[in-house]
């Protein structure tokens, strides 16, 4: 009996590394193993310590191997959308065979021709996704193999990223003893599971509240049109709690998960919990509403930053609405807070598969789902047709347009990739700026309560 095709997704996140193992059984993905390990080798989505990242990858893979009872050798790796560019590309060749029948070799050659374009030396091609083939002027062809023709043309989407970042990811995966089967841009992976086909077609905003950064993406006509990365995420919420309550990061994370609300309207001011305060023998009592206001302040800042970027491309004019996922979105009230700030009805996505019922698994799950749905022609173009003999869904289930849509280059924050902001010299200054704001309401209350607690 032939074993079903196995897919392994690797999500190297700022706060954790996650692995999902899935099998394609009767054109359905079955999750057979998962792994999760705390990550200490990344900062704001950037690998800063290769050895620690390798250790986290090995641990997560080992967990997934034990649960799935298989040996993992090859993984599909998610790539964050920091400084990712998606551009249309075009290639044309003469069909090589004497009988003019288009073969796998011709598909590979026309893709190579599409790659022949000026790519800056600091960037690297991550993948090229075929969208439409043209044979002797006849367009709209999804798979030209077996057809007779003289001229073969290809319209495709070329995805490029910073060479240094891609190299660091490759280095970590290879040092962990694994082979990279393919790369998948994380917003595309998230969209594969978090959005319906209609939502991807009509136009929908997808927000991923990660640990080290938050990403707002726009999917339209089945393609990624726009992506913006804010270098703040759930980890910054934890740091705020740690700084303001004068407690350790581990305590702050535990407090956030056990007592935290993303909206102060949902929390109760008469519910108290103990906080182990640095420099004091006895725990300090803090009410849930105060904690919620600390969390809400940071999430509000993240949402407002994402809104400014989305307003620039008029993303809110699209009819698909807003979908929110990612680890930080699991805090009660995160969706309602987004609705009030962004002015759109929002839907919360969490994987429904057993073992994955946490939004922090969305990307890893999306990676395997995206890879499984790629048509066979994609793998042929990459020269890997023998590795994927049974695609999860037939090619006609994929949505293609007769011409590749014009891609809007992803927009990014003014900060350089992996660089500290020049506006503030340290994280503490940012927190002080939040606390010392001249605005009334929450900020004034924070100042007053801090004085009461620590004076």
Positions of PLM-derived features:
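Adenine-nucleotide phosphate-binding core of ATP-dependent small-molecule kinases
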Residues: 176-181, 274-315
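Short, surface-exposed connector motifs at secondary-structure boundaries
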Residues: 151-152, 220-223, 314-321
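Residue-level signature of catalytic and energy-coupling elements of molecular machines
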Residues: 10, 19, 77, 173, ...
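Glycine-rich phosphate-binding loops at beta-strand->alpha-helix junctions
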Residues: 80, 261-263, 318-337
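Acidic, glycine-rich loop-and-beta core segments that form the ion-binding/anion-interacting portion
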Residues: 195-264, 268
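Glycine-rich phosphate-binding/hydrolytic loop that grips phosphoryl groups
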Residues: 351-398
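Nucleotide/phosphate-binding catalytic cleft detector across ATP-hydrolyzing
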Residues: 1-16, 20-74, 79-204, 248-249, ...
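Short beta-alpha connecting loops at secondary-structure transitions
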Residues: 225-226, 239, 290, 346-354
């Amino acid at each position: 009996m032939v074993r079903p095709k196995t897919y392994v997704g690797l999500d190297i996140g700022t706060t954790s590394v996650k692995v999902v193992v899935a099998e394609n059984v009767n054109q359905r993905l079955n999750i057979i193993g998962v792994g999760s390990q705390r990550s200490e080798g990344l900062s704001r989505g950037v690998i800063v310590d290769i050895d620690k990242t390798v250790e986290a990858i090995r641990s997560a893979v080992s967990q997934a191997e034990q649960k799935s009872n298989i040996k993992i050798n090859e993984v599909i790796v998610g790539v964050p959308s920091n400084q990712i560019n998606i551009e249309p590309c075009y290639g044309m060749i003469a069909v090589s065979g004497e009988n003019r029948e288009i073969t796998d070799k011709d598909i590979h050659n026309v893709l190579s021709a599409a790659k022949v374009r000026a790519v800056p030396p600091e960037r690297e091609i991550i993948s090229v996704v075929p969208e439409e083939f043209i044979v002797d002027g006849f367009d709209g062809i999804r798979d030209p193999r077996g057809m007779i023709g003289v001229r073969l043309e290809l319209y495709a989407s070329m995805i490029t990223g910073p060479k240094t970042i891609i190299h660091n990811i490759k280095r970590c995966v290879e040092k962990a003893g694994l082979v990279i089967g393919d790369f998948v841009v994380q917003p595309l992976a998230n969209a594969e599971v978090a959005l319906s086909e209609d939502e991807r077609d009509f136009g929908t905003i997808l927000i991923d509240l990660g640990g080290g950064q938050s990403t707002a993406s726009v999917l339209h006509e089945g393609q990624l049109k726009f992506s913006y990365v804010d270098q703040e995420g759930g980890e910054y919420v934890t740091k705020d709690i740690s700084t303001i309550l004068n407690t350790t990061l581990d305590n702050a994370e535990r407090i956030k998960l056990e007592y935290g609300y993303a909206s102060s309207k949902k929390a109760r001011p008469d519910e108290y919990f103990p906080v182990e305060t640095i420099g004091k023998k006895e725990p300090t009592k803090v009410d849930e509403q105060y904690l919620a206001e600390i969390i809400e302040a940071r999430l509000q800042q993240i949402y407002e930053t994402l809104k400014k970027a989305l307003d620039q491309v008029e993303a809110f004019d699209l009819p698909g609405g807003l979908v929110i996922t990612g680890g930080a979105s699991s805090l009660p009230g995160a969706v309602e807070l987004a609705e009030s700030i962004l002015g759109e009805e929002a839907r919360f996505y969490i994987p429904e598969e057993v073992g994955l019922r946490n939004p922090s698994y969305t990307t890893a799950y999306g990676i395997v789902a995206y890879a499984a749905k790629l048509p066979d022609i994609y793998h042929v173009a990459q020269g890997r047709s023998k590795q994927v003999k049974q695609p999860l869904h037939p090619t006609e289930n994929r949505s293609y347009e007769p011409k590749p849509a014009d891609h809007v280059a992803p927009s990014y924050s003014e900060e350089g990739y992996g660089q500290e902001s020049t506006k503030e010299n340290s994280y503490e200054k940012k927190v002080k700026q939040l606390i010392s704001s001249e605005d009334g309401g929450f900020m004034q209350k924070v100042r007053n309560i801090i004085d009461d607690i620590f004076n």
